[in-house]
């Protein structure tokens, strides 16, 4: 037991939870509670911590740099992450820190998406009303990880969060807890190749080397 606890405490997991209304949450609220109870996990409730959207960039960078695994926990809103989670990425993952020349603070770390959808799994198919599999909506997450030299780990999803049974939610939470506890010893972790990184010219950052992600235009 002592050895297992020591292993968990050394994991260095930073979990970013983003939900605009926790009172209406059926699944993410349970996952948040489980993460808060897990040893070795630092939890940041973004909407609770930054209700005015004024993110403490230095503190967030310190937390992210100290972690081996960064978890993005949120519902999918219009095929993407909630607004405050996107703002966190824009402001915290700066050029020269997270990517670009000298930007290696996150290199080699894992990025893990833990997400819920309102629609059932059947809706995420060419025949469903979302027209695509969920995989089709993952490129922004994957490329964010790649640009920062991180490993994007297979997402943990729960479809149909509004209607799924309590038994299914409980099983999902248990699986989430086991995965948190077992990191970094996840299947195939040792087979991951290091990302080569990307040389982003300073001139491509119109706001200077301290600006956020490459998705930000003029």
Residue ranges and their predicted role:
Residues 2-44, 177, 198:
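N-terminal beta1-alpha1 ligand-phosphate binding loop
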Residues 8-9, 103-108, 148:
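Short, conserved loop/helix-junction motifs that constitute active-site signature segments
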Residues 14-16, 44, 71, 112-114, ...:
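Hydrophobic/aromatic beta-strand patches that form the interior of the parallel beta-sheet core
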Residues 26-37, 133-148:
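Short, solvent-exposed amphipathic alpha-helices that sit
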Residues 26-30, 55, 83-87, 167:
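Generic recognition of short, well-ordered alpha-helical segments
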Residues 41-65:
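N-terminal beta-loop-helix "entrance" segment that forms/cooperates
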Residues 58-142:
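Helix-loop-strand module that forms the ligand-binding subsite of alpha/beta enzymes
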Residues 142-218:
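Glycine-rich phosphate/pyrophosphate-binding loop and the adjoining helix
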